[in-house]
């Protein structure tokens, strides 16, 4: 399963990690995914969302 937010589609970013000597190597910044249960018209559904999306869901009272 891809490390992607199931509601917003937000995925990992890529770039370089740099030392003080300016050496570089490729790395990946993954999304902080959390399991959440959201309200739907049929009841509730469990989804993987980013921490930022989870915060927004809590703000708008959309969690089951």
Curated annotation (Swiss-Prot):
GO cellular component: ribonucleoprotein complex; ribosome
Transmembrane regions: none
GO molecular function annotation: structural constituent of ribosome
Keyword Ribosomal protein found: yes
Superkingdom in the source lineage: Bacteria
Key word Ribonucleoprotein present: yes
Coiled coil region boundaries: none
Gene3D superfamilies referenced in this protein's UniProt entry, alphabetically: Ribosomal protein L28/L24
Single GO BP term: translation
Sequence segments annotated as region (Disordered): 1-26
Keywords (A to Z) from UniProt: Ribonucleoprotein, Ribosomal protein
SUPFAM superfamilies membership: L28p-like
Family statement: Belongs to the bacterial ribosomal protein bL28 family.
Protein's name in the database: Large ribosomal subunit protein bL28
Species whose genome carries this gene: Ureaplasma urealyticum serovar 10 (strain ATCC 33699 / Western)
Lineage of source species: Bacteria, Bacillati, Mycoplasmatota, Mycoplasmoidales, Mycoplasmoidaceae
Gene: rpmB
């Amino acid at each position: 399963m891809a490390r992607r937010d199931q509601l917003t589609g937000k995925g990992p970013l890529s770039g370089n990690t740099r030392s003080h000597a300016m050496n570089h190597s490729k790395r990946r910044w993954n999304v902080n995914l959390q399991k959440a249960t959201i309200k739907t018209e049929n009841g509730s559904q469990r989804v993987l969302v980013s921490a930022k999306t989870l915060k927004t869901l809590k703000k708008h009272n959309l969690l089951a």
